[in-house]
Amino acid sequence: MSTSWPPRTVIRKASGLRTLELTLDRVGLGPVAGVDEAGRGACAGPLVIAACVLGSNQRKSLAALNDSKKLTEKMRETLFPLICRYAEAYHVVSVPADEVDRIGVHVANIEGMRRAVAGLGVKPGYVLTDGFRVPGLPVPSLPVIGGDASAACIAAASVLAKVSRDRVMVNMDSDHPGYGFAVHKGYSTAVHTEALRRLGPSAQHRQSFVNVRNAAMGSSLMRPLAPRESDTGG
């Protein structure tokens, strides 16, 4: 029995990295945009979302493309300019930590994906997202489980989002020294936790995260009390 397109349920696996896009293109639903994020689980720094439409004839140029989480940092940095060069369109959106705090990580992720798709230079006919549905898109969309390892356009978006965010965190390390942002990129490592305990949260930390709130409470308890007027001799 043949599979109908577009599919109406979550896709869990594709036979090749370009299978979904090429099939959607063949039935007139292209161009296909992939969307992914970086920094969802971090307790500091922005949430970065990218949308990308790949050209159908760029398979050889982007042969090394894969799930960005499986690529080394050097490989991602090598792929980044190639994706920017060969993509039909791409757009990267950054949602700052204070906005993530205000509306929540999940809502920020959904809103960021909408903004990323809206910012594309070409209008997609279909959108593939990594793992969950994105309501409110102006075109049909479908979540793909493990999308950054199953669809080339999502894998490209994953690289764009991760490299863009990593660069932000390296720059942030200069503005907020002592936290090690350039190393752990804002995720809750042992080194980051110790820096939070010692320094307290910075303006780039997500105050809605439990470990950041705990660090803020701890640093305020350790802060010396201001002297009373009677103790100053005034």
Curated annotation (Swiss-Prot):
- Note the coiled coil stretches, chain numbering: none
- Biological source species: Mycobacteroides abscessus (strain ATCC 19977 / DSM 44196 / CCUG 20993 / CIP 104536 / JCM 13569 / NCTC 13031 / TMC 1543 / L948)
Please list the cofactors this protein needs: Mn(2+); Mg(2+)
Enzyme Commission number(s) from the entry: 3.1.26.4
Q: Which Pfam families match?
A: RNase_HII (PF01351)
Question: Which amino acid positions bind a divalent metal cation, per UniProt?
Answer: 36-37, 130
Which subcellular locations apply to this protein?
Cytoplasm
| Name of the featured protein | Ribonuclease HII
Give the GO biological process terms: DNA replication, removal of RNA primer; mismatch repair
* Protein family: Belongs to the RNase HII family.
Q: For this UniProt record, give its keywords in alphabetical order, as a comma-separated list.
A: Cytoplasm, Endonuclease, Hydrolase, Manganese, Metal-binding, Nuclease
Where does the source fall among the domains of life? Bacteria
Gene Ontology terms: cellular component: cytoplasm; ribonuclease H2 complex
Can you state which reaction this protein catalyses?
A: Endonucleolytic cleavage to 5'-phosphomonoester
Where does this chain mainly localize? cytoplasm
This entry's comment on the bound cofactor is: Manganese or magnesium. Binds 1 divalent metal ion per monomer in the absence of substrate. May bind a second metal ion after substrate binding.
**Reported function:** Endonuclease that specifically degrades the RNA of RNA-DNA hybrids.
**In what residue span(s) does the RNase H type-2 domain sit?**
30-221
PROSITE patterns named in the record: RNASE_H_2 (PS51975)
What GO molecular-function term can you cite, just one? RNA binding
